[in-house]
């Protein structure tokens, strides 16, 4: 799943200023052509091998709006043969039960590009943790935006009554901030002939570990027995995050 900001161009304030500039059509077309060139370069350089393997791509804060009503994010989706998911998405993954025909196990995912900022490593994870408390039934929460790669798992305990017995079912939730592929401090970086750091360096922000976390999903059903007989199967997948 893509979480947005695939290009550094253009931020919301950049887009607003370009709109207010009342440029001639030729100038607008030149900017649009350059924006599409950046998309094509990203596709050819890094993403081409992943065509057809995406569940979808979200919109971030950085994109360019084209005259035909589409955006550079939507054009990237076309290249990757992936659906465009907008601002956020609730996704459902289904896992068939190999033992019965009672229906698949359902894994719900909540995904958002993200918003806000924070200096500490735990800042985006704390934001995600607070939000997750309001969303019942979800198993995985993903957020981008802040460029930090950090995640964790928490267990929720739910009561379940089977026949006359009360059982406690433990289900794992994954919370993950999905990282970045933009290095903050680059030796010898220049703008033209001027030695100048990028946004991260200029704002004296903390460097972050590059890459994205990996989440492993192992389908599993917990079998409940009473008096030596199986009474019920409960969907209880094993979820693990590796950073």
Question: How would you label these PLM feature ranges?
Answer:
Residues 1-243:
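Extended recognition/assembly regions associated with phosphoester-bond processing machinery
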């Amino acid at each position: 799943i893509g979480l947005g900001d695939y290009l550094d161009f253009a931020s919301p304030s950049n887009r607003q200023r370009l709109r207010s500039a009342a440029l001639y059509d030729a100038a607008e077309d030149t900017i649009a052509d350059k924006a599409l060139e950046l998309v094509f370069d990203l596709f050819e350089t890094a993403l081409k091998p992943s065509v057809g393997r995406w569940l979808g791509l979200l919109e971030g804060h950085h994109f360019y709006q084209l005259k035909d009503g589409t955006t550079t994010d939507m054009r990237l989706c076309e290249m990757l043969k992936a659906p465009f998911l907008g601002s956020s998405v609730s996704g459902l993954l289904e896992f068939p039960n190999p033992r019965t025909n009672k229906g698949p196990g359902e894994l719900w995912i909540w995904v958002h590009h993200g918003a806000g900022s924070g200096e500490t490593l735990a800042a985006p994870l704390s934001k995600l943790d607070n939000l997750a408390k309001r969303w019942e039934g979800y198993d995985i929460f993903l957020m981008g935006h802040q460029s930090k790669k950090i995640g964790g798992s928490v267990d929720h305990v739910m009561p379940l009554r089977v026949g006359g017995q009360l059982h406690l079912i433990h289900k794992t939730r994954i919370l993950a901030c999905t990282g970045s592929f933009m290095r903050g401090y680059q030796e010898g970086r220049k703008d033209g002939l001027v030695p100048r750091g990028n946004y991260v360096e200029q704002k004296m922000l903390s460097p972050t570990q590059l890459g994205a976390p990996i989440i492993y999903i192992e389908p599993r059903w917990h079998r409940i027995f009473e008096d030596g007989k199986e009474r019920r199967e409960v969907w209880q997948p094993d979820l693990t995050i590796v950073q």
